[in-house]
Amino acid sequence: MPTQMEVEYWRRRYQRMNYERFAAANVIALITHAATQPLDMVRIRSQMLQEGKTFSGLGYQKGWYPFQIMEEIYAAGGGLRKFYSAFDTFFFRTVCYTTARVTAFGYFYDKVNKDPRRVARPDFLVAAGVLGGFIAGVVTNPIDIVYNRMQVDELYPQAARRNYSNTIQGLAKVAEEGALFRGAGANGFKLAAICSSMTNIYDWCKENSYFFFGPHWINRLWGTAVAVAIGTVVSMPFDMIRTRLHTMRPLPNGQMPYNGMIDCFNKIIKYECNSKWMSNFGSFYAGGEAYFLRLFLICYLSQFLVDYYNENYYDQEFWQPQRFHYQSGIDYDIHDPYTDAFNKKLVATYTTATGGMGAAHPSGKENLAII
């Protein structure tokens, strides 16, 4: 049985937010979000163009295609910078979102997973994802409102635009409206759906395909694709509602078009998903292609960036399970439990006062006996 000190060591390394995880997660998020931000612009503008229209199709409003919207945004002038609205808001939103999501999920995952050396049960992962994702969505709602409004501002007539110039001004204007947490529930449920659905599905797909393909790149590819597809299906209705609540403006009579998340959902069902007008539930998935593609690219690219980070800037595991070989299967007889990282650390710390690997042991006191 591991000592309490060893358990705490693994908890700090894998289940809790720390400076190293904060820096790595945000750098990776900034890279992947910057590369895929044009797709996010297409997604939210597709959702805005869908409002008030009947729907006939699968994943996009008939007549509005993602690449057509992207071409129109680029042709309007401003170059690629047009897709990022304001760099300070993009940076602030990405850092806040990433930090809140990783911290909240890690906090609840640390509570439910008592043995940090192993992955938690699927139901525990779902619970941690729902709680952590919902809290992260509520906390980051103010900055999301500002950023979403800046992305769709050009769709309005000149006189009706909000014209936020930066993050601080946008937050101040939203605060004056009393709308900092408008749509926070939908935003929380969106992140809860993403965090709770994708991790389990990805692990299940990758683990089961390993028995057919072995250690092959196809495991990561198809596992990510399936997880992102399910994450898109369960989270995008909340994303649509969130967008409507974030960007809505008063009607001529002074009232808001939606009174909350439930009211928004009911009105979309009644006016945009009614089969009497050849419509369907796909109205909630306007911009779905851009949403899926962006989420897939973020997840897939992040895994390679994590690999690069682990290989160059992170101490590797000192112990490894049995390796799988195509010719002979698992090497029960010739298994060497110590990794190359262990051997490098052994050489680097061989002359320390504690002797050998003593300083590298999780307890910091016990020496490892090499036989």
UniProtKB/Swiss-Prot annotation:
Protein family membership: Belongs to the mitochondrial carrier (TC 2.A.29) family.
Keywords, comma-separated and alphabetical: Membrane, Repeat, Transmembrane, Transmembrane helix, Transport
PANTHER family: MITOCHONDRIAL DICARBOXYLATE CARRIER-RELATED
PROSITE patterns according to UniProt: SOLCAR (PS50920)
One GO CC term on file: membrane
Membrane topology: Multi-pass membrane protein
Subcellular location: Membrane
Transmembrane segments: 22-42, 89-109, 126-146, 184-204, 221-241, 281-301
One Pfam family in the UniProt entry: Mito_carr
Keyword Transmembrane helix found: yes
Name of this chain's protein: Macronuclear solute carrier homolog CR-MSC
Ranges: Solcar repeats: 16-111, 120-208, 215-304
Listed SUPFAM superfamilies: Mitochondrial carrier
Protein's organism: Oxytricha fallax
